[in-house]
Amino acid sequence: MAENFRIIDGGVTAPKGFIANGHKDRKYGVTIIASEVDAVCAGVFTTNKVFAHPVSLSKETLKNSDTFRAIIANSGNANCFTKGGMDDARAFVKKASSLLNIPESQILSASTGVIGRKMAMDILNREVEKAYESLKLESNNENAAKAIMTTDAFKKTVAVEFNVGEKVVKIGGIAKGAGMIAPNMLHATMLGFITTDIEISKEELKNSLQNAADESFNNAVVDGDMSTNDTVFVLANGKSNVNYRECIEEFDKALLYISTELAKMIVSDGEGAKKLIEAVLKGAATKEDAKKASMSIVRSLLLKTAIHGADPNWGRIAAAVGYSGAEMDMNNFDIIISSITSGKETYLVKCGEQLADEGTAELKMAQEIMKDSKIRITVDLKKGEFKNTSFGCDLGYEYVRINSEYTT
């Protein structure tokens, strides 16, 4: 790796002083993440105007408390748009509080699942108890990651460490998400939980998370639908005895790496997805233009289906950039397609001129690249110095099947 940190095992349990476990029984699951000591926390949430009760409750808790000890999350029900949903959200936290012996004011919560269905609190309370019993026996990051899965095909977890003198700082995370992914979380259905043993103020952590989320989670698109429950939390407990101000650049880069890897895992697990799309937009006149254009590429349903079918229909890329609203000159821009895995690449369009035409070597190479599972599309608008990278996935038959049967 180019960065000065190392990939390690353990996810949210890798940093000092954190434990986690979870339990899932068919539809419902519960994850508990706890710190041995008081921690500061930052959170980012969905900007959907229809938002879940745990989002409201966690925003309230973050505002009113300075220190935190635990995160609890459930899968199986979004607890959104339901009568008595806020009471259920509070009861969920209260149950965890009684078991963990941690004040309710120090517990943050999140939910994921079907919208508009009443929480089965009897089942959920049993799952909280089972998750707690599992946590008493052992700390298990894999179980914690599994318990929050819904339509996810695989667990999403990552951790890194870096040195500051003789001391070590660790950051770890878990996430869930496969469909309904197009977060726009101000400075996630997508849930992300990150832990670190850095010593940092609440305001510093908030700024670092906002910057990381803008470049990672907020650049991830599976289907263009924004969830009511998107949430990312970072807990920092200071157990490394390293202060953030000793390693600002290193920590921010490591947090961005964790966030980006989790975001890429989420889009790679898009319901029925087989391919990761990385859209790199450079040469834009403004940062806003760069993001609009790169997001337009990964949002395009026509492009997603072309990627699924390994069809190098570069016109769909050009069209997506063209309607994004970014400043461009159709007679002077580049489109390059490459394999992230093999490094093979070819121009499709260069300086506004089509190269990948019928019978050309460029088209043949593009067809070969499109068969890979990790594809990078690079567009150079030649209008300035701004750049942005967005992440998406292909869209195929399985996505329709999963979502047509979701509540049945």
Swiss-Prot record:
CDD domains: OAT (cd02152). It catalyses: N(2)-acetyl-L-ornithine + L-glutamate = N-acetyl-L-glutamate + L-ornithine. One of its GO terms (molecular function) is glutamate N-acetyltransferase activity. It is found in: Cytoplasm. Keywords: Acyltransferase, Amino-acid biosynthesis, Arginine biosynthesis, Autocatalytic cleavage, Cytoplasm, Transferase. Substrate binds at T150, K176, T189, E271, N403, T408. Its EC number is 2.3.1.35. Its main location: cytoplasm. GO terms for biological process: L-arginine biosynthetic process; ornithine biosynthetic process. Belongs to the ArgJ family. Catalyzes the transfer of the acetyl group from N(2)-acetylornithine to glutamate, forming N-acetylglutamate and L-ornithine. NCBIfam families: ArgJ (TIGR00120), PRK05388.1 (NF003802). This is Glutamate N-acetyltransferase.
